[in-house]
Design a protein with these regions (language model features):
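Extracytoplasmic/secreted proteins, especially bacterial periplasmic and envelope-associated proteins
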Residues: 68, 72, 93, 97, ...
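Bacterial N-terminal signal peptides that target proteins for export
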Residues: 2-13
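Conserved C-terminal helix/tail region of periplasmic/extracytoplasmic solute-binding proteins
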Residues: 320-364
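C-terminal motif of bacterial Sec signal peptides marking the signal peptidase cleavage site
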Residues: 22-24
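Pocket-lining segment of extracytoplasmic ligand-binding domains
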Residues: 112, 184, 189-281
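Short, solvent-exposed loop/beta-turn-alpha elements that line the ligand-binding surface or hinge
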Residues: 71-80, 227-228, 299-312
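Short, glycine-/small- and polar/acidic-enriched structural segments
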Residues: 28-185, 201-207, 220-222, 230
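Secondary-structure end/capping motifs
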Residues: 246-331
Length: 364
């Protein structure tokens, strides 16, 4: 048996190799001058800078709300002259606020980011892949239906969203013609009412609406995002020019996120779940069940691996591109200008690994 000292040394060497394997490409890229990513040389502003983050109160995004409740965003206010304001609003409003420059960062799905930001020519950096939908969105059918046949039926959903994408993927997988299904464009907050009205054959909902309809209205599950793993991603996005002018902004955001999610795998998991459930106004067991439908990247190393996994993102992008182009969501912008990956010249939406890479290096 090796000594404790040798075991500790081995663990340190393994961790160092993992970090280097994840960050080395970016480092070599910077040596040869490739790419044009936002750097993360965080210098403290001379005067107080006020920036803001908008997050909808979805279950998988409640760590942000708890971080705000615990004062995580204000940790660097006095020492680094950066005041991060937290804005909680419905999902559509958070997206609109980001586009209108009312907030500088937003939590959003990859599909919604492309659908909304590319057409508006918004230059934005993805600095965190928080996780993936793993059952968090679902196609739900009335409990009175005894045979699933969606052809010729009407479905309520938020058009051109990740829920719309999920329905398209169901139709493709089951070789059902798109035109055989009618879409009733419905705001997410109105989905439960539309389902209960009985006017629709079904709805496409995300949690907490999906869980509510399954539990309280005996909705039947026809299809959910577990069938398309890692295609619907949840992202932390910031305006590129803001990150360039205020590189410390990313550290505040990343610190706030990990201050909560890292507790979900340790002895403080139960108390953290209870705190988030209280903010979401549901019981802890229900909260846990809904949280399990989101595959979280709950450590900095796991998150860095995710944002650098361009192979996974490119594979998902093949399906997303078809959806976006079929619905003409990006206007005249060519596909090559939509999304770019770490170490490449930034497109409109750029997966920028440097802030997270810097964060990982600093916490070791």
């Amino acid at each position: 048996m090796p000594s404790l000292a040798k075991q500790s040394l081995i663990r340190l060497l393994i961790t160092t190799l993992v970090i280097f394997s994840l960050t080395g490409c970016d480092y070599m890229q910077s040596l040869v001058g490739g790419g044009d990513e936002t750097t993360n040389t965080a210098e403290t502003p001379k005067e107080l800078v006020t920036l803001s983050l908008a997050v909808a109160p979805y279950i998988g995004w409640m760590p942000w709300h708890l971080a705000n409740e615990e004062g995580a965003f204000q940790e660097y206010r006095d020492t680094h002259n950066i005041d991060v304001q937290f804005v909680s609003s419905d999902y559509a409003s958070t997206i609109r606020k980001f586009i209108n420059r009312e907030v500088q960062a937003v939590v959003i799905s990859n599909i919604d980011a492309i659908a909304h930001f590319v057409r508006e020519d918004v230059e934005a950096d993805v600095i965190l892949v928080m996780g993936y939908s793993n059952g968090n969105e679902a196609v739900l059918i009335s409990p009175d239906v005894d045979h699933f046949d969606i052809r010729g039926k009407e479905i309520a959903l938020s058009q051109n969203s990740s829920r719309h994408y999920l329905l398209d993927r169901y139709l493709i997988k089951n070789q059902i013609d798109f035109d055989s299904v009618s879409i009733q464009n419905t705001r997410d907050i109105d989905i439960p009412t539309m389902f209960v009205s009985g006017k629709m054959y079904g709805v496409v909902a995300g949690n907490p609406n999906a869980a509510k309809l399954l539990n309280e209205q005996q909705a039947q599950l026809m299809f959910d995002s577990r069938r398309i793993p890692h295609e619907i991603m949840y992202l932390l996005v910031a305006r590129r020019e803001v990150l360039q002018e205020n590189p410390f902004f990313s550290k505040v955001l990343l610190s706030a996120w990990f201050s909560v999610v890292e507790r979900l795998q340790g002895s403080r998991k139960a108390s953290t779940i209870r705190a988030m459930a209280q903010l979401a106004v549901i019981d802890p067991d229900n909260f846990t069940n809904q949280l399990n439908t989101v595959e979280l990247n709950d450590t900095p190393i796991k998150s860095l691996s995710a944002i650098r996994n361009d192979r996974l993102m490119r594979r998902a992008m093949r399906h997303i591109r078809y959806f976006v182009e079929r619905h003409e969501l990006t206007g005249s912008e060519p596909f090559t200008s939509w999304v770019s990956y770490p170490g490449r010249t930034p497109a409109l939406i750029h997966f920028n690994a440097k802030p997270l890479q810097s964060y990982v290096t600093q916490i070791r």
